[in-house]
Amino acid sequence: MRDCGYSLKKKGYTIKVLNLDDKSCSDCYNPLMYIKESHNNIGYYDEEHPIQEDDVMSLINTIMANTKSENIQNTSGDPFWEKAEMIYLQALFYYTLRHYDKAHQNFTTVLNLIRLSNPDSTGVSNLDRLFDAWGKDEPESIGVKQYKHFKVAASAPKMMSTIIMVATARLASFNIKEIANMTDTDTMELNRIGMPMDNNSPLLKQINSESNKPIGNGKVAYFVITKPSNNTFNYLASIFYTQLFEIIDENAKLCGGSLATPVEIYMDEWAQLGEIPRFVEELAYLRGLNVGITVGLQSLSQLKQKYKDSWESVLDCCDSTLFMGGMSKETLEYLVALLGKKTWYKKSSGRTYARQGSSSTNWDVVGRELATLDELSKMPSGNCVLFIAGIGAFYSKLYNLKEHPNYSELYEPRDNNSQKLYNHKKELQYGENADYRMLCDSGLSFVIPIEKPEIREVDKDDLKDLKLTGV
């Protein structure tokens, strides 16, 4: 981002950043804003079921899959506790999405609801009262049903307290002010992904005419930055990718089955990300929607560690594999087997020194690995081996980036071209396309919307009580 942001901006791209390393330089990302509205069988907004309920379940599944720390894991091995917690969180999310306006549909509200779970002297909590009132108005709501299931499952007070405590621990990071400020609202505009790049595109105009929410053009670049030394907040990146894949599928349908603008997703240091549910299936499916996904790994063991039972399926979904060097024996053995063998002609000669000396020359046909493990491990820097499905392997030099026609637009510290250094924090403060500004509160930066002034004509009656002062 720092190096190529200037070039992207110059070409008219909108740059959005989810920065989990330096949160003051991040756009805002609220996952609840991407829970889709529900429509009935004839295509109209469904008042009785206003949201797509499976989106809520998908979001909670992603959160739970990526927040498995020692302090909240179930050590008994009994799935009951995790299932009960999941039902409890589902009820809270459904309540938030049903009863709060957009400005308050966030994790802060969910945590506030959890704080209402403490029962009074009668054994009834304020949260119970909220759901009882909802149940009278909408007894068939899935949120009401899930809360009733939770109350039945956690009938004992101690059991209920344990489930609530575990749920609180799982969402504890949203109590951190930096994270709350970053996730309370949303400026990511993920719905733009894959849309036509021209605002005047007939297809984009048609889509917006049929949509309740206007969608911007697809000329946008997203950067997801994680902290290399700490994976505490990486679950947000996993949620981001999970929702991004779902939105790509929806946008492809809006565009007639395939995205109007090709999307390239580069997942460098992929092993640092949390678990993305159904990643193998998404990898196989999305490539048919005008989407390319590049996964960067240090070794094969990183892939096996993350997807123990399906790592081979991940590789099967990749049409090309680029090896740029490494020392991992497991990785090298896999690549040697992938390269296969080649037929070699072996020439051998012999000669005897005796009274009746003789000599002989023999040609043999033998099989040999195209490259041995030792040869691959000693491959010179700057070289690579490229595997392409259905074609074979190529041994080549890496492309020299300096030969690219746009290289001069990149920031390069050695070239002393600091004017091409992209600073997203400045864009958040002063960018021409931004309608929000960065403020500082005790050293903490956060993003808030700017209210645009209303301009209108006035008459004499409006000026009766107006007092003018001057110096």
Indicate where each model-derived feature is located:
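Conserved nucleotide-binding/hydrolysis micro-motifs of P-loop NTPases
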Residues: 22-25, 228-230, 299-302, 327-331, ...
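P-loop NTPase motor domains
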Residues: 1-291, 306, 374-395, 410-471
